[in-house]
């Protein structure tokens, strides 16, 4: 899941993580 910190970090690091969280989690 994108909301998962581990997954987000693995996907695109910190920058990508923030973008994914805003697009997916929100």
Swiss-Prot record:
One GO cellular component term noted in the UniProt record for this chain: extracellular region
GO molecular function: alpha-amylase inhibitor activity
Descriptive protein name: Alpha-amylase inhibitor 1
Primary role: Alpha-amylase inhibitor.
Similarity annotation: Belongs to the protease inhibitor I6 (cereal trypsin/alpha-amylase inhibitor) family.
Upper taxonomic lineage: Eukaryota, Viridiplantae, Streptophyta, Embryophyta, Tracheophyta
Keyword entries, A-Z: Alpha-amylase inhibitor, Secreted
Major place of residence: secreted
Residues annotated as signal peptide: none
Cellular localization per UniProt: Secreted
